[in-house]
């Protein structure tokens, strides 16, 4: 079974073509980083315009590389929520056009759920229930995945997402946008002494033991105050301490989620997982605690892409899921829970 995935939820335009939910035939991505870099963040109007300009070309390239025809497609999955409304509409219209011409079934899917489906493109077996850790520019949350298409929120961020915090701290340090890769590089250059004390606070230490929550806005503020009071501190030291404090909270929340649910199998996904310092730390923690943890090995699978949408579509289509042409898109995360 061959399916197409269309991803335009934010600032990547992507078409993916997948066989049986796990074999990649083609993946084309246009990243808008250079378009948004002058503004230090994503500008919705620029994002939707760029999707319009690039999506047809990517579609042609994906079809050519996969050596299939539109009549070979069993379904077209498209991200319908959450995301930037104008951007989502571009992908939705492309899916509708394919449906109208070729009568290909349409599957509007949840962007957040598709991040977890991408792991099956790397051979991770499907076994439920599983904990899902999602860390990206717009999300920092832990879910219980009961099956594809059904996940339960266990803990969310109370303010900024981790990816957003990376960008904001990078801005304070006058590092380029997006901030994640630059902070990771600077942090690797710093070698703390054995008895060195943290210069940034531990996050959410006073929460009840059973509560799973994220909060990163205070960490950004702490960096701002630190820069004002101790101008002599190196960027490398600040980056190392920022990552260490943020990753402490991620690790602590995973520990609480495992304790609370008894589930010892974790899918970790989202753009922040492209930080292999974080991946290595999570794998070390998982091994020590007899937890199975899976994260994308390829950085391209951490970021938004059409292959993950196509992979999720395969499993939903197997269960009989599809929608009429008049489906709607939504910026809201609330619609995904079932």
Swiss-Prot record:
Cofactor: Fe(2+)
GO MF terms held by the record: iron ion binding; N(6)-L-threonylcarbamoyladenine synthase activity
Entry GO CC: cytoplasm
InterPro entries (alphabetical): ATPase_NBD (IPR043129), Gcp-like_dom (IPR000905), KAE1/TsaD (IPR017861), TsaD (IPR022450)
Binding positions (Fe cation): 111, 115, 304
Documented EC number(s): 2.3.1.234
Function: Required for the formation of a threonylcarbamoyl group on adenosine at position 37 (t(6)A37) in tRNAs that read codons beginning with adenine. Is involved in the transfer of the threonylcarbamoyl moiety of threonylcarbamoyl-AMP (TC-AMP) to the N6 group of A37, together with TsaE and TsaB. TsaD likely plays a direct catalytic role in this reaction.
Protein name in the entry: tRNA N6-adenosine threonylcarbamoyltransferase
Organism: Leptospira interrogans serogroup Icterohaemorrhagiae serovar Lai (strain 56601)
Name of the gene encoding the protein in the UniProt record: tsaD
């Amino acid at each position: 079974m061959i399916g197409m995935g269309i991803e335009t939820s934010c600032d990547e335009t992507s078409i993916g073509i997948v066989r049986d939910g796990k074999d990649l035939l083609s993946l084309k991505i246009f990243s808008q980083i250079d378009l948004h870099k002058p503004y230090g963040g994503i500008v919705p109007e620029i994002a939707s315009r760029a999707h319009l300009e690039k999506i047809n070309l990517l579609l042609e390239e994906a079809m050519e590389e996969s050596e299939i025809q539109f009549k070979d497609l069993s379904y077209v999955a498209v991200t319908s929520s959450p995301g930037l409304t104008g951007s989502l509409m571009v992908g939705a219209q492309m899916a509708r056009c394919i449906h109208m011409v070729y009568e290909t079934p349409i599957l509007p899917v949840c962007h957040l759920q598709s991040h977890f489906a991408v792991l099956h493109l790397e051979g991770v077996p499907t076994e439920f229930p599983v904990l899902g850790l999602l860390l990206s520019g717009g999300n920092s949350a832990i879910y219980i995945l009961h099956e594809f298409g059904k996940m339960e929120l266990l803990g969310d961020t109370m303010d900024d997402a981790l990816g957003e915090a990376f960008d904001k701290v990078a801005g304070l340090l006058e590092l380029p946008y997006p901030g994640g890769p630059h902070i990771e590089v600077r942090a690797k250059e710093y070698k703390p002494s054995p008895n060195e004390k943290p210069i940034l606070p531990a996050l959410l230490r006073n929460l009840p033991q059973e509560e799973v929550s994220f909060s990163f806005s205070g960490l950004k503020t702490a960096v701002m105050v630190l820069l004002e009071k101790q101008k002599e501190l190196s960027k490398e030291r600040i980056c190392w301490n920022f990552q260490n404090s943020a990753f402490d909270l991620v690790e602590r929340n995973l520990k609480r989620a495992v304790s609370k649910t008894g589930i010892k199998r974790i899918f970790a996904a989202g753009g922040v997982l492209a930080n292999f310092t974080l991946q290595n730390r999570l794998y070390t923690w998982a091994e020590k605690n007899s937890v199975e943890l899976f994260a994308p090995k390829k950085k391209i699978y951490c970021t938004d892409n059409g292959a993950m949408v196509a992979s999720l579509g395969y499993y939903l289509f197997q269960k009989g899921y599809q929608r009429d042409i008049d489906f709607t898109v939504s910026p809201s995360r609330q619609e995904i829970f079932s």
